[in-house]
Every structure is written in C-alpha cells, then in structure tokens.
Amino acid sequence: MNQIPEALLYTKDHEWIQLHQDGTATVGITDYAQESLGDITFVEFPLAGESFNTGDTFGVVESVKAASDLYMPLDAEVLEVNDEVDAEPELLNSDPYQKGWLLKIRLTDASQVEALLKADAYAGII
C-alpha cells in the first residue's frame, strides 16, 4: 500500500508539495510514483534561479522501466535542488518524502495552492 502523508499536498502528476510559512515549498515525487517507475537511476534537475509556470516540465526521472517528465506544481522559482538525490537517485525509491525531496521553490502565486489535492483526494485517483 502506498504512503500518502496527510500533511502534504499533491498533484495529479504524482508529486507532493510541503508548504512552508515563509512562502517557500519543498517538492518531490510520491510513493506511488516511485513504485510505478521501479528502480530510479537518474534525475535531471533544473538550475537554481530558474522560474517555471504551473505544468511546465522542470526535469526528468529515469528508471530501469521508463523515463518520466517532472512537472512544476505551482508558478515558482527554484531555490535549491537536492544534491543528495543527484548523487544517489535511489533515495527517491527508499525515502521519497524525506531524504528524497527534489526541489525547494519560492511560490510566485500563492493562490494556486488551492488547486492542489489533499491526501484523501489524491488517494482517490491512485
């Protein structure tokens, strides 16, 4: 069974978002996503400082089964990428919600948060 932490928000593209008080957020892929992909072997990250709109492709996750685009969940600027995942992509498989985060972002339109899914709604689509 897939882990779906209640405190996070989700997208239909199987990404999770943890909002922070300072207008930033952490983004990663869900347990369902990593399980569907299988053993993850590579992650293509954006550069810190790049800006994206909701739905823009910001990177790629490659596994032994497939390559899958990553989509920005909100209009945002990339503040930081997870260098540990860059060095050890398997962290996305072993710990997708803690050590396996992908990006830290600064939201540029906080009103978009309302379009994200709560845990129970996300559970309903997987």
PLM regions: where:
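Conserved hydrophobic positions within beta-strands
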Residues: 14, 61, 70, 75-78
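Short, charged/polar surface micro-motifs in flexible loops or helix N-caps
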Residues: 34-35, 77-78, 84-85
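Acidic, low-complexity mobile loops and tails
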Residues: 1-57, 90, 94-126
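Short, conserved catalytic or interaction motifs in soluble domains
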Residues: 63-66, 83
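A short beta-strand motif that forms part of the nucleic acid-binding face
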Residues: 31, 65, 74
